Amino acid sequence: MAKGEGAEQYTNTSLLQKPSPDEVKLAKHETKSRLSVCSKLCYAIGGAPYQITGCAIGFFLQIYLLDVALLDPFYASIILFVGRAWDAVTDPTVGFLVSRTPWTRFGRMMPWIVLSTPFAVLCYFLIWYVPSVDQGKVVWYLIFYCCFQTLQTCFHVPYSALTMFISTEQKERDSATAYRMTVEVLGTLIGTAIQGQIVGMANAPCISTEIDLNSTGLEVAPDVNITDPHVSLQDLRNAYMIASGVICAIYVVCAVVLFLGVKEQKDTCRVRTEPMSFFQGICMVMGHGPYAKLVMGFLFTSLAFMLLEGNFALFCIYNLGFRNDFQNVLLVIMLSATLAIPFWQWFLTKFGKKTAVYIGTTSVVPFLISVVLVPSSLAVTYIASFAAGVSVAAAFLLPWSMLPDVVDDFKVQNPESQGHEAIFYSFYVFFTKFASGVSLGVSTLSLDFAGYVTRGCTQPGEVKLTLKILVSAAPIVLIIIGLLIFISYPINEEKRQGNRKLLNEQRENEMDSETDSTELNVV
């Protein structure tokens, strides 16, 4: 037989066969649900503000409150914990309100995103302003931190739930999620670069104390000039305000691009059920086994990365001695994470999302061990930071890639209960933000108990030991707990594809029913 002869015969035979009605419907459905690259990019850009501001707050707010606003560590821990706890409470509340929002000409999610943006930008800017009245600093930061978190929640919860309304196809949603995660990690890179580099150019000198004496009684840092530290401190405060102004401008631009470039699609699968109460929503989402296991697993792994994020700047300054380089180390982590997102998207497509969780999360452990055990070396720290960024990328991508699978599983098991996507997303954000509040509050309070010295050139041994625990031992334990929970997570690739097929059948049946009803009304 000549080469290609059999293939030609097979092709001719295939062309004579008519596709089945189901194949025709599926092809039309997939074509209609396909997203353009432009739409995916505009959708992805909308996720940047949350990550840019979150990265700036996560990496720099703790050190800002301690060494720039000059707050006592105890009050700083209260601000960080109350702000994140309040933020966590607002997530399910906003999710509940979004789920009851009627459909408008702009959709159900877009009005929340647009209206919250200008007020969120104002509150974010005021977080990085130091009021002149010392007695009112704590109240100032509490008010504007909580207000910003509330307004950002009004942006982020609808934006997260928008994933379910940009397309009905899992493949398209996963692709859009990959675009989004790439831009969001790029957003953390931008946030780290803007905040770190602008602030890094205006470093205020540290203050020598009695613990800065070596065994001979001489100061370790005798060249530090503290005759008038207020001048340099004011420059540092101005640098924080400049950085916040730049971030506010980016926030507004991203919101405009999202609004103009993304069209929210109305789900045609089923008519939405009657709105449920807030506590009914809690029972509904937590009563769905796959969702509860997914959230609990990522709760512990996210807490590990949040502990690392919140304390790594202090660890670089006081344990590793990189006071003038810590912002560059953070930048390397975020740059590596940005570059690794396409790899993890390919990996989860090739080997499955559950496998990606195990490989991606555990890859950070060697970094956590090396930064504590290996003697301080800037070159080694850069290499380890680049390797850690690969794991950070997985931590960004996987939760948002797996949440739509859980929502789809709920729809398959509860076909009569629809329109609750925002509740699922908001409760996930609630748990992760609550974990973030706990991590920041506990870590800052631990530093207070250990004897943290505000703007000190060095710190007591107890503080350095506490920082080692917060960036190494504690995250490793939390990662292990999270991975043990993921063992019982039931949605594998086979289950996911089965749910996809069932949902497509539901949508096709619903569209057929609507078509039949229309024809009967015409007759």
UniProtKB/Swiss-Prot annotation:
Question: Which gene produces this protein?
Answer: mfsd2ab
Expressed, tissue-wise, as follows: Expressed in the developing nervous system.
Q: Which cysteines are joined by disulfide bonds?
A: 206-457
- Catalytic reaction list: a 1-acyl-sn-glycero-3-phosphocholine(in) + Na(+)(in) = a 1-acyl-sn-glycero-3-phosphocholine(out) + Na(+)(out); 1-(4Z,7Z,10Z,13Z,16Z,19Z-docosahexaenoyl)-sn-glycero-3-phosphocholine(in) + Na(+)(in) = 1-(4Z,7Z,10Z,13Z,16Z,19Z-docosahexaenoyl)-sn-glycero-3-phosphocholine(out) + Na(+)(out); 1-(9Z-octadecenoyl)-sn-glycero-3-phosphocholine(in) + Na(+)(in) = 1-(9Z-octadecenoyl)-sn-glycero-3-phosphocholine(out) + Na(+)(out); 1-hexadecanoyl-sn-glycero-3-phosphocholine(in) + Na(+)(in) = 1-hexadecanoyl-sn-glycero-3-phosphocholine(out) + Na(+)(out)
- Tell me the function of this protein: Sodium-dependent lysophosphatidylcholine (LPC) symporter, which plays an essential role for blood-brain barrier formation and function. Specifically expressed in endothelium of the blood-brain barrier of micro-vessels and transports LPC into the brain. Transport of LPC is essential because it constitutes the major mechanism by which docosahexaenoic acid (DHA), an omega-3 fatty acid that is essential for normal brain growth and cognitive function, enters the brain. Transports LPC carrying long-chain fatty acids such LPC oleate and LPC palmitate with a minimum acyl chain length of 14 carbons.
Descriptive protein name: Sodium-dependent lysophosphatidylcholine symporter 1-B
Keyword Transcription regulation assigned: no
Sugar-modified residues: 214, 225
Assigned keywords, A-Z:
Cell membrane, Disulfide bond, Endoplasmic reticulum, Glycoprotein, Lipid transport, Membrane, Symport, Transmembrane, Transmembrane helix, Transport
Q: Which InterPro entries match?
A: MFS_2 (IPR039672), MFS_trans_sf (IPR036259)
Please list the GO terms describing molecular function: fatty acid transmembrane transporter activity; lysophospholipid:sodium symporter activity; symporter activity
Q: How does it sit in the membrane?
A: Multi-pass membrane protein
| Chain residue ranges for the region called Disordered | 504-523
A cellular component annotation (GO) from this entry: endoplasmic reticulum membrane
**Cytoplasmic-side positions:** 1-34, 97-108, 164-170, 261-290, 348-351, 414-423, 487-523
Give the protein family. Belongs to the major facilitator superfamily.
How does gene deletion manifest?
Morpholino knockdown of the gene results in early postnatal lethality.
One GO term under biological process is:
transcytosis
